[in-house]
Amino acid sequence: MEPTSGFAEQPGPVKAESEEQEPAQWQALPVLSEQQSGAVELILAYAAPVLDKRQTSRLLREVSAVYPLPAQPHLKRVRPSRSAGGAQSSDLLLCLAGPSAGPRSLAELLPRPAVDPRGLGTPFLVPVPARPPLTRSQFEEARAHWPTSFHEDKQVTSALAGQLFSTQERAAMQTHMERAVCAAQRAAAQGLRAVGAVVVDPASDRVLATGHDCSSVASPLLHAVMVCIDLVAQGQGRGSCDLRSHPACSFTQATATQGARAGSVRKLDEDSLPYVCTGYDLYVTREPCVMCAMALVHARIQRVFYGAPSPDGALGTLFRVHARPDLNHRFQVFRGILEDQCRQLDPDP
């Protein structure tokens, strides 16, 4: 089917400064990878109390040479502790233990003459974090078991605390999601599934495409996300969907700068289109499915904001496609913008 010209976007009314309002109560929460959001995995290790602190440096050097722990560089080898009498003491991490490990003596664990065990007490088993903590909550959980180094991602910490976006950014995000909600309502009026989506260029805050679910028995793949990606392509002189029967689906013609950028990005292969959504944001009322999530990977979207989760969602519920390390593109995902409104549009079955 030949691409159509679509319906040109008209700029919406500009609010007077006195009409600026605080965004409604919602949180844009990051949807992190399974490694970032999961519980701390623990493995067993052997440690021993340091009975003579004057031997600590030597013991640390000798034990580290025999058991360097290259896969666990986050683990600190010495843990402050207190003796039975309350005096300050320390424990030395010796080596990892198997899952069915039992009590072992110093002679069994530390080979002579590489390690002189003088100054060490009886070894004991202790759970330690298997991998470096990636978030502050993981760090707090990890260090409750054993001292652990932590290289904090300030952006993730701010996002988890709800402090990543300014009031002005939140207001713009709410406006874009409200536009997606309106598109979903227009879809419902046509007897279609009430899911709406908007693609925005964050560099200019310009709306590039507005769409809604157009799927039917004849066209089962026209989910809101797929429609929006095609509309962005139509704005760049590409695209393949005839959406003239859906007046709420519209796009903005690409500017010369956008067109040059779209035409200059490298192609997937000789017969494929350029990446049409490089650097863009998507707002969608419902969490995308696997098909739509993979389409966003191929389109090179930058960020996705969705209102309500979906039972078959692929950006947080069933899968986290956006964070898979084996894919050649990853993007940020946030959930919860106007969640109540979005959930009411298309209630869960």
Curated annotation (Swiss-Prot):
According to the UniProt entry, which residues carry N-acetylmethionine? M1
InterPro entries assigned to the protein according to its UniProt record, in alphabetical order = CMP_dCMP_dom, Cytidine_deaminase-like
What Gene Ontology terms describe what this protein does at the molecular function level? Answer: catalytic activity; metal ion binding
Keyword set includes Zinc: yes
Q: Where is this region: Disordered?
A: 1-25
- Keywords for this protein: Acetylation, Metal-binding, tRNA processing, Zinc
One Pfam entry name: dCMP_cyt_deam_1
Q: Name any cofactors this protein relies on.
A: Zn(2+)
The UniProt entry's GO biological process terms, in alphabetical order, are: tRNA processing
Q: Which residues bind Zn(2+)?
A: H223, C289, C292
Superkingdom of origin organism: Eukaryota
Please report which protein family the annotation says this sequence is part of.
Belongs to the cytidine and deoxycytidylate deaminase family. ADAT3 subfamily.
Protein known as: Probable inactive tRNA-specific adenosine deaminase-like protein 3
Q: Which organism is it from?
A: Mus musculus (Mouse)
Its gene is Adat3
